[in-house]
């Protein structure tokens, strides 16, 4: 869980920027977007297979160059 300690005389904008960066590193926003709507297990499997296929093609293209 991201958290930011604010020092004396530290502007709020800077603390907010630090907090947003920590949230991004932790992957909270992407997780929230992923869980925003229910996704059927069959759709999850399909997306996972497509992603694996894309990774394999990308790896194959990289090996050819």
UniProtKB/Swiss-Prot annotation:
Keywords of this entry: Ribonucleoprotein, Ribosomal protein
GO cellular component, one term: ribosome
Superkingdom of the organism of origin: Bacteria
Keyword Secreted found: no
InterPro entries, per the entry: Ribosomal_bS21, Ribosomal_bS21_sf
Coiled coil start-end: none
GO annotation terms (biological process): translation
GO molecular function: structural constituent of ribosome
The family this protein is said to belong to: Belongs to the bacterial ribosomal protein bS21 family.
Name of this chain's protein: Small ribosomal subunit protein bS21
